């Protein structure tokens, strides 16, 4: 199945030195609408917004930053086939900005007249909120060199299609705090990072979409979101400075609202390309040939939780049942002790290269291996998960290759966690993952996120046919875009230090008060 059979990305050029945009072409595809999302440190972002001190994408510093950011996740609480195609209108471009603290974000267009907002994407929270009628909001993003990008602030009074959500609405969870049923519904979301919160009232307005066909018919999708009047904590320092787009399972989330209004099926997909770019598509229910596993919906705070029943590494297979959350906002994969030990020790026993001795301060991963200077490629044992129901989930990108001072190393990009396992972005790379909230299944199918069903492996990969060794994958370091020179290890600037501190923050919702 072709995900977007005739899509292409149009580069619009620099609007100013800080930002660039990608517009979605009209294209044939599924019964869905979608937009691209991008990795903050991906090549496209670095090419457009070269920041002072930005870590090389394959450097040890890059992976330390991403792993540190992921660790903060641990506090988080944890329609029909013939539907007309719908997509964001021209102007709902995806923007990737160096200074933005979240790793994945996109532009959305809201209101009448419409304004664009650069929102962080988060499957771990539910509420979509925008900075709104606030006096202390972040109003611009600055780039090294002094250029800046002005950010819009939402105002209900400035949009003719905006209405306040009353306290008697089914989406108002704190009606007991209202003076009357007709009062504006208040919200406050507290996060687990240094007094960070968003407070305001719920509003309803138009999220601008168009039919994804030749007619390009405008579809004004009315969604409920937070008018964030007061933001505290790291929101003032640049993390999600222009709003947050919740993708969770609660009724208040945008996917839930779109499904209830009959605009899109109660399902969406996220595709992770090998270059750090990707797509998110609402209404995408996947294909008949995708592999699937049931979602474990657990109250009071449901997440995209699945059950793994078996792990295979090379020729070593272990029956081990454990739950894991599929979380698009986590860069690496975190496993509880039994699963971590099974994978890492099996991998280590089959690895052909010498173990690279490292420290926590140098690399966040425990199992790393040195590459011989004269080797153009190397083999590693294939990793495969079996999900509840029997479907196989081959992990196409379990490794990262990192140039160190003395040699290149490759690491098994998993880490140990004490509470619940998290399937992170690296284990989702090469797949279009479908979060079907109607059927309560998680589906997956190989995809390059652009041209459809091409192989998820852009790196040369062969299964070993030798009976002397277990199955293995072949990996060509030259195909990973590793710079030919070692990264500069000089001290980074103060501006870069601030950028890193923001990237480490991960929103963890405690409660809607």
From Swiss-Prot:
What PROSITE patterns does the record tag this protein with? ASP_PROTEASE, PEPTIDASE_A1
What residue spans carry the Low complexity bias annotation?
455-474
One annotated Gene Ontology cellular component of this protein:
side of membrane
Against InterPro entries, the record matches this protein to: Aspartic_peptidase_A1, Aspartic_peptidase_AS, PEPTIDASE_A1, Peptidase_aspartic_dom_sf, TAXi_C, TAXi_N
Kindly indicate whether the keyword Transcription regulation belongs to this entry.
no
Keywords in alphabetical order: Aspartyl protease, Cell membrane, Glycoprotein, GPI-anchor, Hydrolase, Lipoprotein, Membrane, Protease, Signal
Report the residue ranges that make up the Peptidase A1 domain in this protein.
104-445
Please list the residues that make up the active site.
122, 327
Task: Please give the residues making up the propeptide in this record.
Answer: 485-513
Where is the signal peptide, in residue numbers?
A: 1-21
GO terms in the biological process aspect are: proteolysis
- Location of region: Disordered: 452-488
Output the superkingdom of the source species.
Eukaryota
Q: Kindly list the GO molecular function terms attached to this UniProt entry.
A: aspartic-type endopeptidase activity
- Lipidation positions, renumbered (GPI-anchor amidated serine): 484
Please state where this protein is localized: Cell membrane
Provide the topology term for how it sits in the membrane.
Lipid-anchor; GPI-anchor
The EC number of this protein is 3.4.23.-
Gene3D superfamilies (alphabetical): Acid Proteases
What is the enzyme's class at the highest EC level? hydrolase
Pfam family, any one: TAXi_N
Report the sequence similarity comment from the record: Belongs to the peptidase A1 family.
Q: What does this protein do?
A: Aspartyl protease. Not able to cleave BAG6.
Q: What is this protein called?
A: Aspartyl protease family protein 1
Primary gene name: APF1
